[in-house]
Amino acid sequence: MLILVNNPKAKYDYHLMESYCAGIVLKGSEVKALSLGQGSLKEAYVFVKNNELFLEQFTIPPYSFAGPLNHASDRIKKLLLNKHEIKQIINKKQQQSLSVIPSKVFFRNGKIKVEIWLAKPKKKFDKRETIKKKTIRRELEAEYR
């Protein structure tokens, strides 16, 4: 599994609860740009429309060698999941008021996949706790060295 794009803010801003691996509909120039490691998931989120999942604000910059056949960098991308997985996600999202966020984009068996999470947003004090735990862990690791 080769990770192409990562969302570093996902663990910081959300309590990650349940993950799903989804396929994604891309154009050729988008695949080429992603294989070069270009792309950003920082502001990306998943929304539901007509019982289908879509990924919005996943920016992939234009591929330099594509010429006039290039893609729009802010295009909405469709996610591919089984029907029962989509129903599960929609039900949990509505019942528990969860967000659906992407955490990483990767290659698996020659196909590009997106790892999405059902997540609950953290409050400000939760973020502070996360920072405190991280600094304590770093200090302990520094002492053992």
Swiss-Prot record:
TM segments?
none
Q: Which family does it belong to?
A: Belongs to the SmpB family.
Q: Which gene encodes it?
A: smpB
Q: What happens when the gene is disrupted?
A: Essential, it cannot be deleted.
Q: Name one GO biological process term.
A: trans-translation
Which keywords fit this entry according to its UniProt record?
A: Cytoplasm, RNA-binding
* Cell location: Cytoplasm
**Where does the protein principally reside?**
cytoplasm
Pfam family name, one = SmpB
Q: Name one GO molecular function term.
A: RNA binding
Q: Which InterPro entries match?
A: SmpB (IPR023620), SsrA-bd_prot (IPR000037), SsrA-bd_prot_CS (IPR020081)
Return the protein name: SsrA-binding protein
What role does it play? Required for rescue of stalled ribosomes mediated by trans-translation. Binds to transfer-messenger RNA (tmRNA), required for stable association of tmRNA with ribosomes. tmRNA and SmpB together mimic tRNA shape, replacing the anticodon stem-loop with SmpB. tmRNA is encoded by the ssrA gene; the 2 termini fold to resemble tRNA(Ala) and it encodes a 'tag peptide', a short internal open reading frame. During trans-translation Ala-aminoacylated tmRNA acts like a tRNA, entering the A-site of stalled ribosomes, displacing the stalled mRNA.
Q: Name one GO cellular component term.
A: cytosol
Q: Which domain of life does the protein's organism represent? A: Bacteria
